[in-house]
């Protein structure tokens, strides 16, 4: 294969020819239509609790937290008094099982603990966006777990970063967090396939998927699974009036 520099040079200066099954007109049409928000329905029919969190359809557990339950209008996340305690040695305990999720991770071969926001949603200008979480920016060396799996932030952290939290009544406020990129919902993807040859004519991987961390359903590798069979196998067979046990053509690999 070619590296990027060599491939780019061949395309623009070397006269290399690239053959593709893609149909430029079809590709242009689906790209245009995917930019029109009115082509996609807004999420409806979901249940919320008294705080605006979206509940699962079964069981009543929270599926998506309301953005406002994490971040206030001034852009602060505030730890509630029931979510933390100050210890006598000056360290801070953040309780597990509350709004912040605490995960064991490994960074450069060392154990770390990721302090993360749970998935949330927001509605902006009538558009529904999901936000797949985020995390507090606390360096690795200041964190450990206690016997109850709570997170303990050492006293040294508050000496080195005295402005990370500010006391706001009984709450601790901070802006030192990162949120993952919001994603418009519902998402969608499309692949147009020539059912005679199997050639891909056009494809698009989602709505508003510009961004390094966003998932592109057209180009991201994933396990095909049985969900692909109705599209790639059964639908073309039915269109050709194949019977249940009828074999199709075989082609050498």
Regions found by a protein language model. Name each.
Residues 1-227, 231-253:
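Extended, non-catalytic substrate-recognition/exosite surfaces adjacent to catalytic cores, especially
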């Amino acid at each position: 294969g070619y590296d990027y520099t060599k491939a780019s040079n061949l395309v623009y200066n070397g006269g290399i020819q690239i053959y593709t099954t893609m149909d430029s007109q079809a590709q242009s049409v689906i790209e245009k239509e995917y930019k029109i928000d009115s082509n996609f329905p807004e999420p409806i029919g979901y249940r919320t609790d008294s705080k605006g969190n979206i509940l699962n359809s079964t069981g009543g557990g929270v599926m998506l937290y309301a953005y406002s339950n994490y971040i206030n209008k001034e852009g602060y996340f505030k730890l509630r008094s029931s979510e933390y305690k100050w210890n006598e040695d000056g360290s801070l305990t953040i309780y597990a099982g509350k709004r912040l999720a605490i995960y064991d991770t490994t960074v450069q071969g060392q154990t770390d603990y990721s302090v993360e926001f749970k998935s949330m949603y927001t509605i902006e200008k009538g558009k529904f966006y999901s936000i797949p979480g985020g995390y507090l920016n606390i360096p690795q060396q200041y964190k450990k777990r206690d016997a109850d799996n709570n997170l303990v932030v050492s006293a040294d952290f508050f000496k080195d970063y005295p402005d990370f939290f500010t006391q706001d009544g009984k709450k601790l406020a901070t802006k030192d967090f990162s949120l993952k990129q919001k994603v418009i919902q519902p998402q969608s993807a499309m692949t147009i396939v020539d059912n005679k040859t199997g050639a891909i004519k056009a494809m698009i991987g989602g709505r508003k998927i510009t961004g390094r961390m966003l998932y592109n359903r057209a180009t991201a590798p994933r396990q095909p699974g049985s969900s692909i069979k109705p599209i790639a196998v059964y639908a073309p067979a039915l269109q050709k009036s194949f019977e249940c046990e009828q074999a199709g053509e075989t082609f050498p690999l």
